[in-house]
């Protein structure tokens, strides 16, 4: 069944293959009765299912964009189902995945799928948190013409505001790692959102504890792909986000062939009490933050 959407938007739940053939679940949002002028791919934050982005995706589609949201492997509807017949998610114990896999296998396939389906439209990209990081790791990232990052950081723990940095340090090292090694996966109930595959959580923890985050990972060969991106790049920083401006600037600094534009937004700018790391996607921002984002994504040149 398609997800609920406004009357001027059609949405359809679909699947497409990752680069290694793994089946990924997605939702395609299309405008009804008007010409499509852009294709937009929305890539999620860590442990966040695609349904969180459906209202923003519908908003873009209503303006004439073909929009795809999707779940990374092991997350949301891209988590395999148990064989019980009750449509319950299968245990993540033994499930093999890392954040590098999400980028190389899942995000790259989503870019390729949209590029193939909408050959005649400019392909733009919205990356929330990890979704922004992932763009730099893609071998095919230069297929993207414009990228809008939303709270996308190189999340070294010491760049976070206090006391958030200490909460994250304890959560990852003294709660998350022991739980992950005991259970075989990181349970969402521990305070991270959705359950995470063991390999994803362990790699994320290593990055968070490294001064330049993923840029310090000697085994991450895909770092060399950052320089391939030559499109427009705008990165949104929210003043009340506990993951801070220096972390955003650190990530942007890796895009050597682009000229990143970092914009800091206060809640007052949006007429809101708070925005933080996740608030951009709340529908209360449709006439403020969303409109500005859409106009930038739809711009030419």
Predicted regions and their residues:
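N-terminal cap/lid segment of alpha/beta-hydrolase-fold proteins
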Residues: 1-32
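Active-site glycine-rich loops that stabilize anionic/oxyanionic intermediates
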Residues: 37, 42-48
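The conserved beta1-alpha1 loop
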Residues: 43-45, 71, 237
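Conserved alpha/beta-hydrolase
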Residues: 50-90
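Alpha/beta-hydrolase active-site loop
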Residues: 93-117
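Alpha/beta-hydrolase-fold enzymes
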Residues: 126-212
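Short beta-strand/loop motif that positions the catalytic acidic residue
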Residues: 229, 235-237
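Catalytic active-site module of serine/aspartate enzymes centered on a nucleophile-bearing elbow/loop
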Residues: 265-301
């Amino acid at each position: 069944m398609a997800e609920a959407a406004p009357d001027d938007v059609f949405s359809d739940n679909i699947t497409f293959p990752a680069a290694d053939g793994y089946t990924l679940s997605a939702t395609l949002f299309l405008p009804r009765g008007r010409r499509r002028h852009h294709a937009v791919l929305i890539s999620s934050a860590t442990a966040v299912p695609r349904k969180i982005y459906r209202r923003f995706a519908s908003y873009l589609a209503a303006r004439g964009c073909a929009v795809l949201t999707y779940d990374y492997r092991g997350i949301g509807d891209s988590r395999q189902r148990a064989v019980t017949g009750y449509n319950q998610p299968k245990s993540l114990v033994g499930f093999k995945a890392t954040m590098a896999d999400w980028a190389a296998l899942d995000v790259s396939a989503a870019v390729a799928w949209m590029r193939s389906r909408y050959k005649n439209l400019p392909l733009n990209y919205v990356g929330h948190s990890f979704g922004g990081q992932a763009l730099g790791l893609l071998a095919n990232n230069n297929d993207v013409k414009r990228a809008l990052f939303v709270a996308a950081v190189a999340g070294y723990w010491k760049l976070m505001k206090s006391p958030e940095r200490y909460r994250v340090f304890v959560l990852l090292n003294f709660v998350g790692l022991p739980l992950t090694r005991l259970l075989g996966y990181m349970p969402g109930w521990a305070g991270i959102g959705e359950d995470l595959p063991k390999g994803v959580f362990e790699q994320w923890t290593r990055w968070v504890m490294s001064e330049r985050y993923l840029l310090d990972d000697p085994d991450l060969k895909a770092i060399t792909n950052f320089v391939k991106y030559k499109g427009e790049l705008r990165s949104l920083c929210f003043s009340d986000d506990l993951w801070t401006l220096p972390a955003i600037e650190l990530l942007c600094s890796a895009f050597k062939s682009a000229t990143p534009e970092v914009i800091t937004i206060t809640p007052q700018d949006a007429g809101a009490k708070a925005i933080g790391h996740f608030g951009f996607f709340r529908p209360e921002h449709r006439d403020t933050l969303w409109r500005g984002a859409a106009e930038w994504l739809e711009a030419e040149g």
